[in-house]
Structure formats: structure tokens, C-alpha cells
């Protein structure tokens, strides 16, 4: 299982937890990695939110539990040398999708629709059962109410956002390419 490019260059550890017998089926491998501060959290000004978390490992775990109906049972946090760490299982069942043969627009649309339904289903059942009090209401119901208040405007809003986001991503990529090609990124 990959640990994400945000963790590149940081220490991480894989730990084998031996099960109750010699059978491999009851062994578990967990990883511990340093949790990073997301860019958006630097702009959070509400002291109640900022002070809610012990460290970035704690924030990451609480967020994952709130977003996933069936979070990893080994999901947790700890601290090593004063740095917040994320703890999770290295799943023996996790596999990447093989996108190599997916080139037909109709097949792509069907896969995207299936992935969207799976993601929505996983997320929609999660926040009420997270066991945390940071958000004292059901985000699912709040989102549903916001959409219901202007159902006709929802799809155009998403389309406008997607186009704006795409334009920003392309512009950012162009800036990166210009800097990279002109040797203006130290260390690369």
C-alpha cells in the first residue's frame, strides 16, 4: 500500500503484529507515518477547531473516521519524538484499479458513475457514527437540505466549479512546467 506523496521523504514504519497462532491469516501489518498539515488547515481561524486536535495524526484520524463509514479498525494515532503520527493497517486486500484497457468514453462514464456512487455511499453514512463532537450535526442532512433548497441550481454550480478548478489546475501546471524547465525549482 502506498503512503502518499505528501509523506515522501518522511520516516514511516511497517510493523508486523503476530496473530494468536502460526497461521498467516491472523497476522496484521500496520504502518506508522508522520501526519502532515494540510494546506487548508493553515487558514482555519476558529479556536474551537484549532484546539480540538492534539496533533496532525489525531486530526487525520478524526477526519477519516468522519468521512468513512467503515474506517480501518486499526486506524489510530500516536506521537514519536513530539510529532503526530497516523497508524493504520496495510490491507492485504487493497489493489489499484487497472485503467490500462479503459479507453471507451461510455465505459469511462460507467466506471466514474460507479466510483461516485461507492464514494457517496461510504461518505454519506459516516459522520453520524464518528463518535466526535466537533461538528454537532449531520453533515449529510445539512448537505441534502442545501441541495434541496436550490435543486435547479446545483448542477450548474458543480459544473462552474469544475470548470474553474480545471482552469486553475491547468494554469498551476503551466507555472510548474515553466519553473521546472527554467531551472527555478531548487533541488530539481
Where do the model's predicted regions map?
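Conserved ATP-binding subdomain of kinase catalytic cores across diverse folds
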Residues: 1-188
